[in-house]
Amino acid sequence: MAGRLDEDLKDVTLLGNQNTKYLFEYSPEILEVFDNNHPNRDYFVKFNCPEFTSLCPKTGQPDFATIYISYIPEQRMVESKSLKLYLFSFRNHGDFHEDCMNVIMNDLIKLMDPRYIEVWGKFTPRGGISIDPYCNYGRPGTKYEKMADYRMMNHDLYPEKIDNR
């Protein structure tokens, strides 16, 4: 099987670029996509992002999380280095945990139009409480909409112990 041709990757500009510029403000425009070579089948793509940081909008204190992003692609897929830089752009962004996860999901839906996507943030405790917002989306009118409902109802049936962070 042949790999991808350079012309297939013309819109992927950050991967392999030695002059990467790190943005310090929320920057959804940095996200890049490439074509899904297997749109005829369902499969999950999962990103584990253990170095997410943002700021509390009230106190300005830093918040830290591992974010899990899973999606079933349609025609387009997010390029991982652009995703890394996008997530890094939240470093000085002041928003609540729940808002950050929904913003990330909405930006990825707008970018890729996936069949299904879920974003789960597992934030480290602050003040003795950890917050783990989960959001998902299934394309309306399809089996993925039903899948989203099912996964939402069952996403956290077995709460974890806090010692796993």
Curated annotation (Swiss-Prot):
BP GO annotations: queuosine biosynthetic process; tRNA modification
Protein name per UniProt: NADPH-dependent 7-cyano-7-deazaguanine reductase
Organism: Bacillus mycoides (strain KBAB4)
Entry function: Catalyzes the NADPH-dependent reduction of 7-cyano-7-deazaguanine (preQ0) to 7-aminomethyl-7-deazaguanine (preQ1).
Classification via Gene3D superfamilies: 3.30.1130.10
Catalyzed reaction equations: 7-aminomethyl-7-carbaguanine + 2 NADP(+) = 7-cyano-7-deazaguanine + 2 NADPH + 3 H(+)
Enzyme kind, highest EC tier: oxidoreductase
Family recorded in the similarity comment: Belongs to the GTP cyclohydrolase I family. QueF type 1 subfamily.
Pathway listed: tRNA modification; tRNA-queuosine biosynthesis
One MF term in the entry's GO annotations: preQ1 synthase activity
InterPro entries linked to this entry: GTP-CH-I_C/QueF (IPR043133), NADPH_dep_7-cyano-7-deazaG_red (IPR050084), QueF (IPR029500), QueF_type1 (IPR016856)
Residues at which substrate binds: V78, E79, S80, H97, E98
Leader sequence segment: none
The enzyme's E.C. designation: 1.7.1.13
Active site: C56, D63
Keywords: Cytoplasm, NADP, Oxidoreductase, Queuosine biosynthesis
Domain of life: Bacteria
